[in-house]
Amino acid sequence: MNNPIKMLISGADMGSLIASCALHHDFHESSRQEDKFQIYRIEKDTLTMEDVDACDLSGVRYAVNATLHDNEASFAFDEKCKEQGITVIHAVNLGKTAFLAVEKPKGYPFSEVVKKGTDDFRCSLGKYISQYGMFWQMPVPWVDEAIMHYSKESFTQQGIGAYIAAGYCDNILVNLAEGKEVKYFPKFYLSPLLEEI
């Protein structure tokens, strides 16, 4: 019997969806895969520095940051994980869209998305996605629309994007656990509810 993969999920609403997906994942496809995920939770959408200081990272292989990313403590959580060599997955609900980024311990910092003294996190993230798409000549105009909508009214934490993010996050966790390739930040995963093919 192999050891379970220990992971820490921060975030209450979307964090619970991600935990549920991970707990119900079937590893039957791989004979060498560990038995399951062992999940530890910080059930808060807004972290404090006290939460970050108190979280025990011993034995944790992966961390998921599904918080609102609305203060410095959220990014301090990432840094604490990275200092311990832990890969951090960021899951963000953008209404009817999900954004996910995988941050290597020594990779490009996800906190660079938010420039100090500028817009809130989701607006900064929308600008990052839009500029990334324009640079690679793959524009994503619906992201601009989603962010414009968000500036007028906030996203529900349990909206469609949260469910999409939970499913994607589970797939990323399984790929990491099985040693399969994933995209690392500054690359990212972006999934609208429906996309023309």
Predicted segments with their positions:
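Glycine-rich adenosine-cofactor-binding loop
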Residues: M1-H24, E29-S31, D170
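Phosphate-binding loop/pocket of nucleotide- and phosphate-handling active sites
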Residues: M1-L8, D13, N175-I197
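Short, well-ordered alpha-helix to beta-strand connector turns
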Residues: P4, S58-V60
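E1/E1-like adenylate-forming module used to activate ubiquitin-like modifiers
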Residues: L8, R61-I164
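Mid-domain beta-loop-alpha active-site segment that forms a flexible
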Residues: I18-S20, S154-A177
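Short, well-ordered alpha-helices that flank and scaffold nucleotide-derived cofactor binding pockets
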Residues: C21-H25, E79, N175
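NAD(P)-binding Rossmann-fold cofactor-contacting core
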Residues: H28-L47
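Short amphipathic alpha-helix with an adjacent loop that forms part of the alpha/beta core around
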Residues: E50-S58
